[in-house]
């Protein structure tokens, strides 16, 4: 979206954490990139670099929250807006060890309340409602999140019912639930295949491999790792459905991406995923449990008309989203907030 703002004539500076080998400053597609600090020090570096130095250089600062915000209401000398895709909430318990998990879970509502009078931008009604539950008083704009255009050569569905997961192999994504649901499906349905695309923490990947082995389904489960975009889209187009079981998402952009390939999604009824799927139109939303997911898989395989209807609905729903539109909506909201 920032590239589109630059093309519209805006000047954009993006401050981010550094990484090994990264230049401290660069220009990418017209965007000035400034890097300092690392994961746990980037917030302090932002204060050191920009405190008292924003006015006259910028019209607005966007405080983008990825679990931890930059606390701009406490130090920015120009109006700030909050960009937040999702609250962490339950993710703390899956991705952090005690006591960090408990501390993070307890503190998150309190530090987000510092922004209650700050204009916020998010990508789903679920996150908007989460913010409102914290007593948010300022406007919250939901930005329809788009994707780059997906170009997929026409391919047929795999002869064997194939299900797909795309994303991080991480505890909060509950990929272990997908494996258990697939085992349930295999035990009482036609033979199928499960492809897991993505990587993640080695300990969790090993846990998944042990689970697959203990269930005796190694022959039907493929750990694909990260794939080139074209290959990922080809596999999406061949799959009967995308499976998503996260504890929560901001939206679940891969759902829209799969939909652009004509592939519906079977998802848990959790924040974000219940927004990105239209139940019975672009996919199916089920109660969060492997058994409910397996039932949805069996239902889809046994009902070709449902397959066709959901595939068409997923493609049509995905076509209502574009990055051009996302950039326009967010830019218009930003301009309106400074007038």
Which stretches of residues belong to each language-model region?
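Conserved acidic donor-binding segment of nucleotide-sugar-dependent glycosyltransferases
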Residues: 279-280, 284-290, 299-305
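Nucleotide-activated donor-binding/catalytic signature segment of Leloir-type glycosyltransferases, i.e.
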Residues: 206-227
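Membrane-proximal helix-turn-helix segments that form the acceptor-binding/catalytic region
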Residues: 100-120
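Carbohydrate-associated surface elements
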Residues: 126, 146
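Short hydrophobic beta-strand element within catalytic cores of glycosyltransferases
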Residues: 255, 264-267
């Amino acid at each position: 979206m920032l590239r589109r703002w630059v093309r519209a004539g805006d000047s954009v500076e993006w401050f981010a954490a550094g990484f090994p080998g990264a230049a401290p400053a660069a220009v990418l597609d017209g965007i000035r990139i400034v890097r300092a600090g690392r994961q746990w020090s980037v917030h302090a570096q932002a204060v050191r670099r920009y405190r008292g130095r924003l006015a006259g250089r910028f019209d607005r600062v966007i405080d983008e929250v990825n679990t931890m915000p930059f606390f701009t209401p406490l130090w920015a000398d120009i109006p700030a807006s909050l960009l937040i895709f999702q609250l962490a909430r339950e993710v703390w318990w899956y991705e952090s060890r005690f006591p960090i998990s408990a501390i993070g879970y307890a503190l998150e509502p309190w530090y987000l309340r510092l922004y209650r009078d700050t204009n916020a931008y998010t990508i789903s009604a679920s996150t908007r409602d989460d913010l409102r539950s914290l007593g948010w008083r300022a406007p919250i704009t939901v930005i329809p999140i788009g994707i780059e255009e997906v170009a997929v050569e026409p391919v047929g569905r795999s002869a064997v019912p194939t299900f797909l997961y795309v994303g991080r192999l991480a505890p909060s994504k509950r990929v272990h639930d997908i494996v258990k649901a697939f085992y349930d499906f295999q035990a009482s349905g036609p033979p199928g295949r499960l492809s897991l695309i993505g990587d993640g923490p080695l300990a969790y990947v090993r846990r998944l491999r042990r689970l697959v082995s203990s269930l005796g389904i190694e022959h039907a489960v493929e750990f694909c790792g990260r794939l080139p975009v074209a290959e990922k889209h080809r596999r999406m187009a061949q799959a009967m459905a995308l499976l998503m079981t996260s504890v929560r998402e901001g939206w679940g952009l891969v759902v829209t991406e799969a939909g652009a390939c004509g592939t519906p999604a079977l998802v848990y009824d959790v924040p974000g995923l219940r927004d990105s799927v239209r139940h019975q139109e672009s996919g199916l939303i089920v109660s969060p449990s492997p058994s409910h997911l397996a039932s949805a898989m069996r239902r889809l395989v046994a009902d070709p008309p449902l397959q066709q209807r959901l595939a068409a609905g997923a493609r049509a729903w995905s076509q209502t989203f574009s990055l051009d539109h996302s950039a326009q909506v967010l830019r218009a909201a930003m301009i309106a907030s400074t007038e």
